[in-house]
A protein has these predicted regions:
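Mobile-element integrase/transposase regions
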Residues: 6-15, 19-76, 84-92, 224-240
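Active-site beta-loop-alpha junctions of metal-dependent nucleic acid enzymes
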Residues: 78-106, 280-282
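Short, solvent-exposed loop/turn segments at secondary-structure boundaries
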Residues: 80-81, 118-123
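RNase H-like two-metal-ion nuclease catalytic core shared by retroviral integrases
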Residues: 109-110, 120-121, 139-163, 176-178
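Two-metal-ion acidic nuclease core segments, chiefly of the RNase H-like superfamily
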Residues: 123-141
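Active-site-proximal acidic segments at structured loop/helix or strand boundaries
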Residues: 159-262
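C-terminal, non-catalytic macromolecule-binding modules
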Residues: 262-282
Length: 282
């Protein structure tokens, strides 16, 4: 357009021309948002958030926060992990359900790989491990629409609140100390804040009413633990998550299985346990 008007005798500056054109362009219609209202125990929102790194010995581990928020009462569950692997994701759910003493009926997720492997429009292929967890606890996993982060605004705001009210300026000795402080904060400061739907009530009071309507926890625990196949070379060690763990020398040049949780690494040959080691994070 600028070239065209120059050919017709326009002598103004390009910046002035851009201002003139900007005033003539049609503006996109403002998008309206509905305020989210949920029934007690109807929904929770889940997300990961990165909180920097921890130096453990020679290793620099990411500090990841698993956050779950009950959409009705705004009760927050917070747990820090040294990774965002699937086992940590599942463990965060299990610990949150224990903390809430029940399970919400719907869990809302962003389209993270731990929840959604593939999505084409409304056709969703869930992570089968998450579906197994959902079947065990009887909740419905539900991803938000792509580029619709506002649909899980409760957990996004909770993460900002965690950064400002809990994490900023906090000191801790190790991950266990940080998680102990996080638990105390969730049950104290975060629970005592004003409930947004009724300023006369606290989040704690709203949660006490909501807790009665949560789904009952199953009698047996969900089987947690990361299981991976590993190959033993000519030396009697396997490599798992940046560290070497010993196995009996009789099992060199074999394919074995590792079953690991936060604290322990077990090495299996079929169902037989060959070795058990404390998990090393450095």
């Amino acid at each position: 357009l600028h070239v065209m008007v120059l050919e017709r005798g326009y002598v103004g500056a390009p910046s002035h021309f851009r201002l003139l054109i900007a005033g003539m362009r049609p503006h996109p219609a403002a998008e309206a948002y509905l305020r989210l209202r949920t029934l007690p125990a109807e929904q929770a929102q889940v997300d990961w958030s990165h909180f920097g790194h921890l130096q453990i010995g020679r290793a620099r581990r990411p500090l990841m926060a698993f956050v779950m928020v009950l959409s009705h009462s705004r009760m927050v569950f917070l747990r820090f992990f040294l990774d965002a692997r699937m086992d940590s994701f599942l463990r965060g759910h299990a610990l949150a359900f224990i903390a809430f003493a029940g399970v919400p009926r719907v869990l809302l997720y962003d389209n993270l790989k731990s929840a959604v492997l593939e999505r084409q429009g409304d056709a969703i292929r869930f992570n089968p491990t998450l579906l197994a967890l959902a079947g065990h606890y009887r909740f419905e996993p539900r991803p938000v629409a792509p580029a619709r982060g506002n649909e899980k605004g409760r957990v996004e705001r909770a993460i900002r609140y965690i950064r400002d009210s809990f994490f900023a300026g906090r000191t801790f000795t190790d991950l266990d100390d940080l998680n102990a402080q996080a638990q105390a904060w969730c049950l104290g400061t975060a629970a005592d804040r004003r409930w947004p739907q009724d300023g006369a009530l606290s989040v704690r009071q709203a949660f006490e009413a909501e807790r009665e309507k949560l789904l009952v926890l199953p009698q047996r625990e969900f089987a947690l633990g990361e299981r991976v196949a590993v190959t033993v070379d000519k030396t009697p060690y396997i490599r798992f998550d940046l560290n070497d763990y010993s196995v009996p020398h009789t099992h060199v040049r074999r394919t074995l299985a590792v079953l690991a949780d936060e604290h322990t690494v077990r090495i299996l040959d079929g169902s037989a346990e060959l070795a058990r080691h404390p998990r090393c994070w450095d």
